[in-house]
């Protein structure tokens, strides 16, 4: 997301050369759709992380329903953006803005897939060892949610500065992922009776890392 925003840094419209028309409304509508999709994704990711902490499988249907809404939102953004390109035949700067919007929507959809994968892995884990905590994974998930929120704010405000701050947070989350991975490897070696559970936790940590890469 942040790479798309930084890449469009030079796409600032020259108002002296561009008359405000319904086309501006199209651009604003696409932006609104992306923000709404981002809010859905934040909700889904939060629910997936809560599932890790609470292991309340009653949340599963909600997560899957949100995934459907996210997929539908991505399709709507892609189709509306494509139609706008066809109708308006935008100039270079606006053309890049629309292409960036399509890329961001696709990225958000992929992050949503990771959130659903996390929920599925929790479901597969079935039994949670009561004497072990998943605080490191939970903290990693919270950090990913925070980064996602910051990236969406950067997009909403068209702020290159905020997008660079997201990049700085990446390094901190990478360290947390490494810590989380090492902790669960140690637990796996110490308690091979629950190796299936810890294996799922390692996969979940990987899903969170992949989400971070997309952000």
Predicted stretch roles:
Residues 80-105:
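Hydrophobic/aromatic-rich structural module bridging two neighboring secondary-structure elements via a short loop
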Residues 1-12, 214:
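Single conserved hydrophobic/aromatic residue that forms the stacking wall/gate
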Residues 45-48, 52, 144-155:
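Long, non-coiled-coil amphipathic alpha-helical linker/lever segments
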Residues 35, 39-42, 64, 68-75, ...:
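Generic structural signal for well-ordered, non-transmembrane alpha-helical segments
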Residues 84, 89, 162-211:
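Long amphipathic all-alpha helical oligomerization modules
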Residues 103-124, 151-154, 163-167, 174-177, ...:
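A structural feature that tracks compact, well-ordered secondary-structure segments
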Residues 87-94, 127-137, 189-196:
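A cross-kingdom feature marking solvent-exposed beta-strand/loop segments within repeated
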Residues 15-68, 77:
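Leu/Val/Ala/Ile-rich N-terminal alpha-helices, chiefly Sec-type signal peptides and the beginnings
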């Amino acid at each position: 997301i942040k790479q798309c925003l930084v890449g469009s840094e030079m796409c600032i419209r020259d108002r002296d050369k561009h008359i405000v028309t319904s086309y501006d409304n199209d651009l604003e509508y696409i932006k609104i759709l992306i923000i709404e999709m981002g809010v859905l994704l934040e909700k889904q990711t939060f629910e997936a992380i809560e599932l890790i902490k609470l292991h309340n499988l009653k949340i599963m249907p909600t997560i899957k329903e949100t995934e459907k809404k996210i997929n539908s939102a991505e399709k709507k953004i892609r189709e509306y953006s494509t139609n706008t390109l066809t109708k308006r035949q935008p100039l270079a700067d606006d053309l890049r803005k629309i292409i960036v919007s399509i890329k961001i929507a696709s990225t958000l959809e992929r992050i949503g897939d990771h959130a659903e994968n996390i929920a599925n892995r929790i479901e597969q884990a079935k039994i949670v060892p009561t004497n072990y905590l998943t605080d490191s994974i939970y903290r990693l998930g919270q950090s990913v949610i925070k980064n996602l929120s910051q990236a969406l704010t950067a997009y909403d405000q068209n702020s290159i500065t905020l997008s660079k701050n997201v990049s700085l947070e990446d390094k901190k989350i990478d360290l947390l992922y490494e810590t989380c991975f090492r902790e669960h490897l140690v637990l796996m070696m110490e308690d091979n009776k629950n190796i299936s559970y810890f294996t799922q936790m390692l996969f979940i940590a990987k899903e969170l890392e992949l989400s971070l890469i997309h952000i």
